[in-house]
Amino acid sequence: MAKPKGERKGKSAINEVVTREYTVNLHKRLHGVGFKKRAPRAIKEIRKFAEKQMGTPDVRVDTRLNKFLWSKGVRNVPFRVRVRLSRRRNDDEDSAHKLFTLVTYVPVASIKGLQTENVDASQE
């Protein structure tokens, strides 16, 4: 059914600052990738995942996440990784985008049974 003419859509949630935790399955994203390109491709796939989930083209990857992905070498990238995606306001005045996404590594004992969670600002 069509909406009445005077009714307006709600505010887009993409402009809000939000933080969520995700589990990224790198195994399926790196299937068929040559050995010497696996760790670099893993970084690119996480960037692509963050861009899609948060809707911001500006994605920044934390150094601890980079170190974790490279920890077993260029070939043997971990199958799954738990990440925290944080959509934040860009303080830089001359930047092209108002928001950016910061991707940080969340160390967990076991990946099993975890789901996507919203993280409060107090927990960050």
Swiss-Prot record:
Gene3D superfamilies: 3.10.440.10. Keywords: Ribonucleoprotein, Ribosomal protein. GO terms for cellular component: cytosolic large ribosomal subunit. GO terms for molecular function: structural constituent of ribosome. SMART domains: Ribosomal_L31e (SM01380). InterPro entries: Ribosomal_eL31 (IPR000054), Ribosomal_eL31_CS (IPR020052), Ribosomal_eL31_dom_sf (IPR023621). GO terms for biological process: cytoplasmic translation. The keyword NADP does not apply. Pfam families: Ribosomal_L31e. Transmembrane segments: none annotated. PANTHER family: 60S RIBOSOMAL PROTEIN L31. Belongs to the eukaryotic ribosomal protein eL31 family. This is Large ribosomal subunit protein eL31. It comes from Spodoptera frugiperda (Fall armyworm).
